[in-house]
Amino acid sequence: MEYLLMYTAGKDPQPYDPSDDNIAEWSADTQARGVSEYGERLRPGEDATTVKVRNGQVLVTEGPFTEAKEWVGGFDIIECDNLDEAIEIASKHPAARFSSAEVRPFMVWPDAEPGHRVVPHGFPEQPTGGKRYLMLVCVDPNGEEGGSDDVEPWVQEMDGRGVRLFGEVLRPPEDATQVMVRGGSVIVSDGPFTEAKQWIAGIDFLEVRDLEEAVEVAAAHPMARAGLMVLTPAWPFDVEDDHVERARREAPELGRRSEPALGVAS
């Protein structure tokens, strides 16, 4: 089974202690076990951009999609035997101690080709050719009704342009599991990380020229009309880095937006 791990503030966020960040150890363990497909840290919530189409107009707003401004700070895609193993893997990630890790299974399609994976084999070794964004494909009860919900033409176009690197539909939020570690104990609860009426239905990982192109790609997705899309740039870092020094170096970037201000486009 393939699972998406999303790292969020959760309901009981703890102060981040870079001296206690064991991400290098976690990464080495998942690689050695052969369960890791790919993962990225993401820019802070201020750099998220929400895109939706209403009445033919592309509406672009800064920030995450929820009123509470909850955001996804990073993700990993893993393949393991079952949910219990996925929870065990998530519980060892440093985010489980400082915040929360959501475990959500990907859809399994009966007509999928044998050996199909969300992340293509060899992808992590490919060089970066542009700016990368995680795009959250979200359901919005206030979205437009009617219209085509066939995403395949969009997938074929974006794959052909080389801007969509991979993506897949997720199981519904009822199948989400929250994992936290507090006081050395693993705390597991059911449901998604946010109680907002909008919910994450799938993901796509994009590589584009800039935010303007990312918005254009997102707006072309059928779910931009029925729902909304959230674009957050990847924030790569070296897991072997001195995390205390990295946190000091990156501190000035927190709490402010580094992505361009866009407003409304048509």
Report the location of each language-model feature:
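Conserved, structured core segments of small domains
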Residues: 1-266
